[in-house]
């Protein structure tokens, strides 16, 4: 069954942890991204985890292999249950990330999930410099590489999930941002969006939702409504 990940896209730890506290008993996952992590560091990962959530540390590592290996190792030691890298970093970087994942797990006793970013959901067809391939085909090709390199899954839009599952197998996980209840872009920078029901029907395993939950008058109610929509889909 697909799971909801709420994005804590805030500039300060106190605001993020307060929001996570308001969401206890709803979504099983919280996402800590670049803005929050740069403001608060690893302590915010631990603070959110202490509230009973699993934490997706969304830092999209993309650097030389040794640097990524160390960064992933540190991310795991911070208490993250899921981390990610950019697949465009290539095979050596991806395999180094897998090594860092297992090195970090020697401290924590638990191996997190490692995902590879294919194409950002804020990117539309024709916006990738020097790449004329169909964006869906390009994402599926990157995903197949990620599967071969030992990753657990990929970050992709809902539009690529079916082709990725066909190429990589049903057990290869797909995490989908750009989820918008009602299907609207919401006035933000996401381009390739889906409703929760559409994404679950497409086969997504994790749905990332930020502002439609955290910006709602009642965030817990908004999260529960999305989870109910997800649960109603049979696939």
From Swiss-Prot:
Catalytic activity, as annotated: orotidine 5'-phosphate + H(+) = UMP + CO2
Organism listed in the record: Nitratidesulfovibrio vulgaris (strain ATCC 29579 / DSM 644 / CCUG 34227 / NCIMB 8303 / VKM B-1760 / Hildenborough) (Desulfovibrio vulgaris)
The protein's enzyme class: lyase
Complex and partners: Homodimer.
GO molecular function list: orotidine-5'-phosphate decarboxylase activity
Keyword Transmembrane helix: no
Functional description taken from the UniProt entry: Catalyzes the decarboxylation of orotidine 5'-monophosphate (OMP) to uridine 5'-monophosphate (UMP).
GO cellular component, one term: cytosol
Pathway of action: Pyrimidine metabolism; UMP biosynthesis via de novo pathway; UMP from orotate: step 2/2
Name of this protein: Orotidine 5'-phosphate decarboxylase
Enzyme Commission numbers on file: 4.1.1.23
Binding site for substrate: 9, 31, 58-67, 121, 180, 190, 210-211
